Structures are given as C-alpha cells and as structure tokens.
Amino acid sequence: MAVKIRLARCGRKKRPFYRMVVADERYARDGRFIEKVGTYNPLVNPAEVVVAKDRVEHWLGQGAQATRTVKSILKKEGVAVS
C-alpha cells in the first residue's frame, strides 16, 4: 500500500477548497482517505493554510510521499519535507 499526502477537492463549482489528506494512491482523488491532516483555501489572499504539523511529520516518518503541490505548501508552512 503506497500512501500519499495529497489534496482532495471540496467546495462548489468555480469555488475550490481543498482538504489535505493521507490516502492510498489507488483511491480516487476525492474518495476514501486514511486521515485529514489539513486544509487549503486558494481563494483568499493570501491563501489560507491549516496544517496539523505533528500528524504530517508522523506520516512522512511512516513513509508517506507528499505530492509536488503538497510539498510546496508544506515548505511554505515550515514543515521539513525530503
């Protein structure tokens, strides 16, 4: 089971809001997930990000891979991502 930290789209048409989730890579983008570790709202200026840093670090320590977009968000929030 390859685990990824990625963004799941929520919100409505033309008004995206994202949940940062830990999920098996085989699951659909907006489908099942293991744990919600944060949120990302790109519509406000500056973008609003809420991250449970301890849980993200836990999952990264367990071998989860962050997607490219999530890596850039986490770097801006000060979470060490390899």
Swiss-Prot record:
Disulphide linkage map: none
GO annotation terms (biological process): translation
UniProt entry tagged with the keyword Disulfide bond: no
UniProt keyword annotations, A-Z: Ribonucleoprotein, Ribosomal protein
Cellular component terms per the entry's GO annotation: cytoplasm; small ribosomal subunit
Pfam families named among the record's database cross-references: Ribosomal_S16
Transmembrane segments: none
Single GO molecular function: structural constituent of ribosome
Top-level taxon in the UniProt lineage: Bacteria
PROSITE patterns listed in its UniProt record: RIBOSOMAL_S16
NCBIfam families: S16 (TIGR00002)
Annotated family: Belongs to the bacterial ribosomal protein bS16 family.
PANTHER family membership: 30S RIBOSOMAL PROTEIN S16, SMALL RIBOSOMAL SUBUNIT PROTEIN BS16M
Name used for this protein in its record: Small ribosomal subunit protein bS16
Organism: Desulfosudis oleivorans (strain DSM 6200 / JCM 39069 / Hxd3)
